[in-house]
């Protein structure tokens, strides 16, 4: 059944069958994110909202660490399944699951050990320290659960088990939504309560994911007895996983940089940007879901050397993703004030947040090009292209644009920097993709 999906099913249908569950899980996660932001803002404490916004990049960092073995492992497994090397795929799966657990425990220990220094780097000051520290502590304690969850959620999709991958995300998000108000208000935990609910949701999701791999999968395993992988295979995983991780690390870096630039204009600007970025995630993560949801399809057909089907997959992916990005941009720009008002009904927050949201949205269509291109690089094992794109949009290109635009246009320059970075990165992605397709054509001739 899974082979039919990857090899014979019509491209739009196969792509959507794999991508829609990912998108739906993203939407559920977004609903949680919005509810989380709503409950935090409902406290009415501007310093609390700003404190959580300053520490929010840490959650993205956890996902980045999880991507090392989550996306790196799933890329390797997809290609192995396409090459009909099921036993090698099983070994790779077991290795990635156990190493991600150990890695997560190490990260938790490091984050707790260097808490004071890291909070300082995040830009936490005396006004926000109480709330930021409370939120950070629980996120650090639960880092292992967040990092580990990225592994099984990604590898399940390589076997076509996208629904099971989605279910874990939904279960975790529902737990978050239920316990958010209980911890924040019922137990009077405030910022710490929001983090506690997040960690609890991830723990429950992890339990489900392990069950799904053990009971639903036919070609994957959690058994430590299958952990025998070669150094070459580990290198293959890391060559894709590290660039994939850098993508999210750069997002964390971007958020920290932006917050630090905005701090000079007041905590109200940081609070407004925190809300705007959360809302911006609605479109961004849906686009991410559609881009990376089809990644197993790309990897499988690349491994199977089915050039014709691979080209059809990419054509559909680019056209669909870019059209969706443009639609989201139009809708978000029109309704920006009303959306921001839902979270915090303060005139200055609404005005600043709406402007920030619009500037963030301008580059969505261009971001779509970068997303699909990054997905392809990871799926086909092109570590060089994946690395370049991972350090561009919210890394090297963004930093250069941010410094130039902020010096020339001040506050407005800070806000428009991401959109400018999106355009430049899309051009870089186009060049990389042309080289990949040319190489693929020459290889198959």
Sequence positions of predicted segments:
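Transmembrane helical elements of multi-pass membrane transporters/channels
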Residues: 17-36, 138, 172, 201-205, ...
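Small-residue-rich hydrophobic transmembrane alpha-helices
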Residues: 49-109, 146-165, 259, 272-336, ...
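Residue-level hotspots within pore-lining transmembrane alpha-helices
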Residues: 28, 32, 62-66, 106, ...
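N-terminal transmembrane alpha-helices
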Residues: 7-38, 42-43, 57-72, 76, ...
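Short alpha-helical transmembrane segments in multi-pass integral membrane proteins
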Residues: 1-19, 77-144, 186-242, 298-363, ...
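Hydrophobic transmembrane alpha-helices of multi-pass small-molecule transporters
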Residues: 61-64, 176-181, 206-210, 282-285, ...
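Helix-terminus/linker motif at the lipid-water interface of multi-pass membrane proteins
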Residues: 27, 31-49, 119-126, 182-189, ...
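Short runs within selected transmembrane alpha-helices of multi-pass transporters and secretion channels
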Residues: 139-157, 165-173, 194-207, 288-291, ...
């Amino acid at each position: 059944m899974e082979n039919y999906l990857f090899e014979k099913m019509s491209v739009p249908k196969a792509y959507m069958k794999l991508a829609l569950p990912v998108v739906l899980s993203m939407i559920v996660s977004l609903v949680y994110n919005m509810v989380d932001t709503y409950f935090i803002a409902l406290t009415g404490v501007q310093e609390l909202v700003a404190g959580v916004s300053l520490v929010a990049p840490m959650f993205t960092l956890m996902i980045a660490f999880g991507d090392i073995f989550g996306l790196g492992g799933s890329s390797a497994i997809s290609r192995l399944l396409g090459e009909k090397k099921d036993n090698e795929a099983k070994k790779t799966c077991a290795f990635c699951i156990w190493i991600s657990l150990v890695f997560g425990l190490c990260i938790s220990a490091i984050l707790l050990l260097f808490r004071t220094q890291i909070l300082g780097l995040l830009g936490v000051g005396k006004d926000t320290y109480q709330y930021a520290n409370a939120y950070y502590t629980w996120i650090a304690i639960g880092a292992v659960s967040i990092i580990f969850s990225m592994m099984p959620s990604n590898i399940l999709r390589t076997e076509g088990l996208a629904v099971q991958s989605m279910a874990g995300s939904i279960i975790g998000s529902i737990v978050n939504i239920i316990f958010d108000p209980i911890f924040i208000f019922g137990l009077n935990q405030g910022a710490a309560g929001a983090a506690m609910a997040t960690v609890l949701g991830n723990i429950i999701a992890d339990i489900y994911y392990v069950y799904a791999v053990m009971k639903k999968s036919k070609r994957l395993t959690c058994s430590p007895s299958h952990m025998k992988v070669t150094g070459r295979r580990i290198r293959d995983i890391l060559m894709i996983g590290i660039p994939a991780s850098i993508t999210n690390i750069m997002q964390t870096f971007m958020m920290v940089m932006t917050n630090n630039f905005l701090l000079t204009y007041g905590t109200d600007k940081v609070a407004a940007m925190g809300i705007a970025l959360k809302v911006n995630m609605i479109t961004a993560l849906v686009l991410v879901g559609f881009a990376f949801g089809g990644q197993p399809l790309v990897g499988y057909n690349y491994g199977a050397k089915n050039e014709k089907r691979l080209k059809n997959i990419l054509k559909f992916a680019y056209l669909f993703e870019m059209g969706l990005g443009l639609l989201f941009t139009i809708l978000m720009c029109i309704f920006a004030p009303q959306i921001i008002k839902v979270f915090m009904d303060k005139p200055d927050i609404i005005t600043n947040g709406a402007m920030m949201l619009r500037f963030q949205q301008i580059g969505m269509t261009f971001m779509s090009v970068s997303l699909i291109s990054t997905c392809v690089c990871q799926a086909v094992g092109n570590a060089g292209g994946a690395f370049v794109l991972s350090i561009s949009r919210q890394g090297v290109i963004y930093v250069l644009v941010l410094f130039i635009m902020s010096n020339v246009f001040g506050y407005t320059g800070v806000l428009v920097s991401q959109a400018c970075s999106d355009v430049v990165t899309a051009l870089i992605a186009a060049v990389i993709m042309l080289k990949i397709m040319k190489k693929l054509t020459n290889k198959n001739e």
